Amino acid sequence: MAITAAQVKELRDRTGAGMMDCKKALTETAGDIELAIDNMRKSGAAKAAKKAGNIAAEGTILIKNGEGYAALLEVNCQTDFVAKDSNFLAFANEVLDVAAASKVTIEDLKAQFEETRVALVAKIGENINVRRVEYIDGANLAQYRHGERIGVVVTGEADEETLKHVAMHVAASKPEYVNPSDVPAEVVEKEKALQIEIAMNEGKPAEIAEKMVIGRMKKFTGEVSLTGQAYIMEPKKTVGEVLKEKGASVSNFIRLEVGEGIERKEEDFAAEVAAQIAATKA
């Protein structure tokens, strides 16, 4: 049976697959479009399963405001080339729209978009993962994206420009907490024990070591907290001092960066080539 251009176009419109893939699928099913779609879906699922073990540590961070909150989403792929692909970005934005509409959990997002994800993996040829979504509440929100890789949302009592600048600071300086007093007790105790050991190893008398540790702990809690950090736009002042001068405050922030916490496989090119040569001789 001859496959017509109209059949190929219909299958392509319905699946988003390439023209040659559509023609091949139709040829294999003697022009049965519905069967071709089923076969392509099965093939896509098989390809996605094979790609599932591949590390996806590239991708994008997207932000969108909802009603009284903002959603931050990370979607991963394997290469920065695909991270710029229009199909990948369209998929990520589609997921974001659903997330921002009603604070959908990451588990529900994964389930809702699994079929679409599988089809995209088959089309693009890389593992794709809807990794995480975070929500931040606030009537006064400011967001900042540094390229595609870093996204920040800050909420507080301040004008839009001030909050935007603070969001830029968060992107650059990576604070973990809002205020020094927010650093959890267990984190403080762990660092304190480390600093005591360091001071004692330096041969300092106990009373001097204790004073040194107090100073170092103040520095530590300042460095890991937003208001205790030196402000990137006025390094001689802390963020807290700048906010106080403006009669402003920050109550919360979220910072996401593509791939953070993902263990990346170190590629040994020489070893890879050697393995390929060995395989040809086997």
Curated annotation (Swiss-Prot):
What does the UniProt entry say about where the protein is found? Cytoplasm
Q: One GO molecular function term? A: translation elongation factor activity
Say yes or no: keyword Ligase present.
Answer: no
Q: Which UniProt keywords apply?
A: Cytoplasm, Elongation factor, Protein biosynthesis
A GO cellular component annotation here is: cytoplasm
**Region of interest: Involved in Mg(2+) ion dislocation from EF-Tu:** 79-82
- Protein family (similarity comment): Belongs to the EF-Ts family.
What biological function has been recorded for the protein in this entry?
A: Associates with the EF-Tu.GDP complex and induces the exchange of GDP to GTP. It remains bound to the aminoacyl-tRNA.EF-Tu.GTP complex up to the GTP hydrolysis stage on the ribosome.
UniProt-recorded name of the protein = Elongation factor Ts
- Source organism of this protein record: Shewanella woodyi (strain ATCC 51908 / MS32)
